[in-house]
Each structure stands twice: as structure tokens, then as C-alpha cells.
Amino acid sequence: GKGINLYTSIYTTAIRGTIRHNSIYSNTGLGIDLGNNGVTLNDTGDVDTGPNSLQNFPSITSATSSTRVVTGRLSSRANTKYTVEIYSSPTCDPSHFGEGKVYLGAVSVTTNGSGVGSFSVAVLSSFAVGSKITATAIDPAGNTSEFSACRAAN
């Protein structure tokens, strides 16, 4: 099954579900699923509603093992400060979106007026070449995104 599933019922919508520093891996579904419907694709401006406000996930653009540097970007609400947490796993889910076996570190990302923020961070923990690197984004209210798509470390 899924690692963590946040969803809307007839009684309530799960919000402010902060998921931090966890080890979520080796399950048969997504590591984090907002809405109980598989990967929730990112949307421009991230103004939708639903479990954890359907917080957009970051995208990893590179992960370099020798320097422990991970780069990426987040497209979400404009002029907002987020925490991006970075993880590694030996494999990805069948969806090619991540899980998070090993917590590597976090970085603050502030989006611009268009809702885009970039990051480049030397994480605290090392990771091997070929490791699958993923990330989550946490908004100021504590809403955590699903894991990003996997990026193989070089």
C-alpha cells in the first residue's frame, strides 16, 4: 500500500499534515499520496484546495554525489517561504515518483512574484552515485507535498 495517505472524506479534508524527517520506502504505492488518487500533478499558482492544500512538490534538477549538492526548483504560491526536504532511496516507486528512505537535509526556498523559487544546497548526509533523490515541500501552514519525481544521482 501507500506510505502515507491524506484524503478528503465526507466529514473533513486533511490539512496541515506536516510530514518531516521520516523514512518512507519499500511500499507498493506512493510514499505520500494527497487525495488517494496517485500522483497529484503540480498546478500553476498552487491555489487549489484538498488534502494538505494539494501542495505542489519540488523538482530535482541535479544531484551530485561527490559534492553532496542537490539543485532544483519549486513552483507554488507567489512570494512565500517554503521548506524543501531532500531524501535518497535505492529505488523509485513504479510511478517514478519518490519515496524517502534516508533524510539528507533541508533548505528554505522563497518563491518570487511568479511563484517560482530555485535551490542549490550541500546536504548534510552523503549519497551514492545512482541513488534516487527526491524532495518534498512544506508550506508555512505545515502542509507537506507528495514526493517529487526521482532524479538519479551522478
Q: What residue spans do the PLM features occupy?
A:
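Glycine-rich beta-solenoid repeat tracts in large extracellular/virion proteins
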Residues: 2-13, 30-37
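Beta-strand signatures of extracellular beta-sandwich domains
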Residues: 33, 83-87, 134-136
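Surface beta-strand/loop "capping" patches
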Residues: 42-77
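Exposed aromatic-hydrophobic patches
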Residues: 71-73, 114-126
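Extracellular Ig-like/FN3 beta-sandwich strand-entry sites
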Residues: 79-81, 128-132
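Solvent-exposed serine/threonine-rich low-complexity stretches and specific carbohydrate-binding patches
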Residues: 99-114
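Edge beta-strands of extracellular beta-sandwich domains
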Residues: 141-154
